[in-house]
Amino acid sequence: MAKRSIFRSVAAVLAFGMCMTGLAGCGSEKRADGKTEIEVVSYKPEAVKAFEKIEKRFNETHDDIHLTISSPNEAMTILKTRFIREDYPDIIAIGGDINYSNFLDADLFDDISDLDEVQTIKQAYLDMDKELEFIPKDGTYALPYVANAAGILYNKDLFEENGWKVPTTWQEFTTLCDEIEQSGTLPLYLGFKDTWTCLAPWNALAVGLTDSDTCNQVNMGNTTFSDTYGPVAEKMRALLDYAEKNPYAYGYNDACTAFARGEAAMYPIGSYAIPQIKSVNPDMNIGSFTFPANDEESDNVLNSGIDLQFSVMKSCKNKEAAYEVLKYLYDDETIQIYLDDQGGIACKDGDFAIPETLEDMRPYIENNRMADYQDHHYPSEMSVDAMIQTFLLDTSDNAQEKFLKKFDSDWKRYNRDLIRKVQDYQKEQGDA
């Protein structure tokens, strides 16, 4: 992923280019056959077969528009390079994360709030996009498509054989871990050698123990991570008591393999790990439950984020044609084509199947008890995953205090310009 400092340079070039050229672009051009060309660039190369099928069906049913969907490797790098060259596609399909925030802040996206399909999206996912705005903006700039969910994967057969129940509170969770341990089975496998895996349980705990807009509140100067992340850090460290010895010696693949072989009853990771696990044990019966981070079940929140969403570029010359493409993409049958190929949770309200592995999460999904991954707000150059691993390796008495202080200081260091921008906006609003 490109560093934020690099992107700031990209944004500066973009701002200059837009002023000088009026958003010149290559999208929405007329083809030799008279059709309007609409180009979509997706950041998900793993979904290329689904998009090829969708593209083919669209083109077979539309006489006036030709749709091209590309899903290149390193799509984000390619997009940023194209933006510098003012070679804009009409629509981009990316995740709801810091890249979306940066592109939106660079004023690249058009307001699509007049698109009827906006009204069909689950409110929780629209709210996630609003919280990704550095500065509040009127309008809607992305249409969430498919979401994922992360909590704790568990071996359903092991649970059934031993009479173990899915926990709904932190006390029930630790009691269950003790019970599993006493049976001779390892409760958890972590695989923290690959630092990014540290973020999986961190995010799942954080959404239940902190407000979803914590990062924005820190930017506004209303709180600090030292004041808010203490319970998250405490419970993150508590997981070590129930995991493999020296989890920093084993990586993601090791953890998937160990869990697949029944070496641990649970694995705190997202549903995205299931294909890797099933490559080792295709017949494994896997479930996934919301991380029970709180003392009361009613306080728990499912960690769910937007895996894919569509934004219309401001440079798009034919918004009507772009809207026709979006309407087709958000047809129930089209969404199902994507879900059948890639899985996930439909962001659109409707009668879409929830994957069997996520069935325990259904009440949270259906009742919008969901919040976005906190790391979607973290600047990549801050390397929060490595910070968490370092904290967990630190056995000193003041390890947590040092970790949280560093989180605060590094946040200010890597978000200095953003914090100034947010607080200037707050002052302007106060003076208005």
Predicted regions, residues:
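A structural signal for short loop-to-beta-strand junctions that line the ligand-binding cleft
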Residues: T81-R82, P89-D90, Q119-D157, L186-L190, ...
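Conserved C-terminal helix/tail region of periplasmic/extracytoplasmic solute-binding proteins
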Residues: E160, Q336, R369-A432
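Mature extracytoplasmic/periplasmic domains
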Residues: L108-D111, R261, Y272-Q276, L308-M382
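Glycine-centered hinge/linker elements that transmit conformational signals in sensory
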Residues: C177-I180, V218-Y248
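Extracytoplasmic "Venus flytrap"/periplasmic binding protein-like
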Residues: R57, T61-Y125, D157, E161-N162, ...
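Extracytoplasmic/periplasmic solute-binding protein
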Residues: K137-Y145, A150, T174-G221, A264
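Extracytoplasmic/periplasmic substrate-recognition and gating elements
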Residues: E60-T61, H66, D138, N162, ...
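Hinge/lid segment of periplasmic solute-binding proteins
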Residues: G95-A150, T174, I180, P201-N203, ...
